[in-house]
Amino acid sequence: MMTLEPNQEQLKKMKSHPGFIAALDQSGGSTPGALADYGIEPNTYSGDDQMFALVHQMRTRIMTSPGFTGDRILAAILFEDTMNREVDGEPTANYLWQNKQIVPILKVDKGLAQEKDGSQLMKPIPQLDSLLMKAKKKGIFGTKMRSFIKHANPAGIEAIVDQQFELAQQIIAAGLVPIIEPEVDIHCSEKAQAEALLKQAMLKHLNQLPKGQWVMLKLTLPEQDNLYSNCIEHANVLRVVALSGGYSQAEANERLSRNHGVIASFSRALTEGLTAQQTDAEFNTMLDESIEKIYQASIT
């Protein structure tokens, strides 16, 4: 089978343009919380259809906001439901790239399995191949998949990294660039040890990748500044991006600015303070200020 290639124009932007990634990919499980933060309480809507319609309105408001452009934002991570919908009458991925010069990325995982060896692997993704084909047709550049590390257990961390890189091969073959996201719990009591084990396991896999195969890494901001510099410099790594992981926007930005070459891929820290009740002017101003702060922290 011929391996498909990623979109070269988007690859070039992801590789060399300053900026960060907006994570707009809360899925079924985290949507009620995201809506509540936005000022829409669960008792004001009923059923998944209404919930997803409301969250799409919220995301549309973000994506169409004047400050939300490719000047400071490299890419946006979308939930599958968002990819299947439209923004301003255009399919979401097209809208982002054609109108905003923002690279579209799709969250592909189906959530986390039960904890084993101090980690949570991803649940199986049975229809991954057909989802990747659909994403490629819709103009998606890359994917994102998250697993979760709670303790510094070598067996658990190795299992997480093995699974991530195995699925990454399937994604690369479909002509997409995978974001590998082995999140380390910010409340982990042995966080620094877990991060050292994670780095070791990732470098082992990265060193086995053939020339020209790209991956991105999405990681918790580490206890030791610049811990992941070897990963940033690795020939197969397009970008190393950081999740906010429950840190406030101020703390996430502060930690990010100390990690040179790492850029943000924030979700909660990006939308902090935005509400449905704000006027468009208030909403756009607050979003623009958040984008600027995260952008500045990303270019250090």
From Swiss-Prot:
Q: What class of enzyme is it?
A: lyase
Q: Which Pfam families match?
A: Glycolytic (PF00274)
As its record notes, the protein acts as a catalyst of: beta-D-fructose 1,6-bisphosphate = D-glyceraldehyde 3-phosphate + dihydroxyacetone phosphate
> Where does this protein act, in terms of pathway?
Carbohydrate degradation; glycolysis; D-glyceraldehyde 3-phosphate and glycerone phosphate from D-glucose: step 4/4
This protein is called Fructose-bisphosphate aldolase class 1
Tell me the protein family, please: Belongs to the class I fructose-bisphosphate aldolase family.
Q: Where is the active site?
A: 181, 218
- UniProt keyword list: Glycolysis, Lyase, Schiff base
Write down the HAMAP family for this protein, in alphabetical order: FBP_aldolase_1
EC numbers for this chain: 4.1.2.13
Q: Which organism is it from?
A: Synechocystis sp. (strain ATCC 27184 / PCC 6803 / Kazusa)
Q: Which NCBIfam families match?
A: PRK05377.1 (NF003784)
Gene Ontology terms for molecular function: fructose-bisphosphate aldolase activity
Per the record, the domain of life is Bacteria
Mention one GO biological process in which this protein takes part, according to its record: glycolytic process
